[in-house]
């Protein structure tokens, strides 16, 4: 891998006993050698089970349809890609020359697949209990925020849909400042929307800062206070 994995271990909060599993999880099918598709398959199933179980316990009165919608929101590719960005997986992915040249290290589907592959690798490296604990620690913020019956779309998605409906360019997000150590950082994000002044927001994670910025932009576009 291009970077030392020590920082990645800190970011995902797990140290592999078998580093080969992590290397496989970070290997795209375009790269020579054993790639991550089998681990992705395994991780996808484990993630779905862990999140379904957590939602079932958290919302004892929720209907099946609401539980399914919440699970879909939490395990969809967009959510997993957000984790991939937060973890900085693009710096560790092993890609073939063509995929690397085309920017595969930042492609949403590639990042999402890598997150699922890491989950599969963690399970094989430990057990279902440790793997489940890790997944729930990653998802703590999102599980606390979600509720049955509510619109499951987050501010970034709503802003994107608002702009697309008006045939406008999609927003851009840039981290302009990061302070603090891993697990205790503050991120400053700039959101750029055509025709608007740039919007600056701060959050304890890149995702939080981006969501705050998107929410501000949406309110301005809708002329809300």
UniProtKB/Swiss-Prot annotation:
Q: Which GO terms describe its biological process?
A: mRNA processing; regulation of gene expression; rRNA processing; tRNA processing
- Which NCBIfam families does the UniProt record give? RNaseIII
- Which GO terms label this protein's molecular function in UniProt? double-stranded RNA binding; metal ion binding; ribonuclease III activity; rRNA binding
Q: What does this protein do?
A: Digests double-stranded RNA. Involved in the processing of primary rRNA transcript to yield the immediate precursors to the large and small rRNAs (23S and 16S). Processes some mRNAs, and tRNAs when they are encoded in the rRNA operon. Processes pre-crRNA and tracrRNA of type II CRISPR loci if present in the organism.
Q: Which organism is it from?
A: Pseudoalteromonas translucida (strain TAC 125)
Q: Which GO terms describe its cellular component?
A: cytoplasm
Please give the name of this protein.
Answer: Ribonuclease 3
Q: Which InterPro entries match?
A: dsRBD_dom, RNase_III, RNase_III_dom, RNase_III_sf
Active-site positions on this chain: 44, 116
Instruction: Cite the record's note on assembly.
Output: Homodimer.
């Amino acid at each position: 891998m291009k970077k030392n994995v020590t920082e990645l271990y800190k970011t995902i909060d797990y140290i592999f006993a078998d580093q080969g599993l992590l290397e496989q999880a970070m290997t795209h099918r375009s790269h020579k050698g054993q790639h991550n598709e089998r681990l992705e398959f395994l991780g996808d199933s484990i993630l779905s089970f862990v999140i379904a179980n957590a939602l079932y316990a958290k919302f004892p009165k929720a209907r099946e349809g609401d539980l399914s919608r919440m699970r879909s929101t939490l395990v969809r590719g967009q959510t997993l890609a957000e984790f991939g960005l937060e973890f900085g997986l693009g710096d560790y992915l092993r890609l073939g020359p063509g995929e690397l040249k085309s920017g595969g290290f930042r492609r949403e589907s590639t990042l999402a697949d890598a997150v699922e592959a890491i989950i599969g690798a963690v399970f094989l490296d430990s057990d279902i209990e440790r793997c489940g604990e890790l997944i729930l620690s990653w998802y703590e913020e999102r599980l606390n925020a979600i509720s049955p019956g509510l619109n499951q779309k987050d501010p970034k998605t709503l802003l994107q849909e608002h702009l697309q409906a008006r045939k406008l360019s999609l927003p851009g997000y840039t981290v302009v400042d990061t302070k603090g150590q891993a697990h205790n950082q503050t991120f400053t994000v700039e959101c750029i929307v055509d025709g608007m002044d740039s919007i600056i927001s701060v959050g304890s994670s890149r995702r939080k800062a981006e969501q705050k910025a998107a929410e501000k932009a949406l309110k301005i576009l809708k002329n809300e206070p």
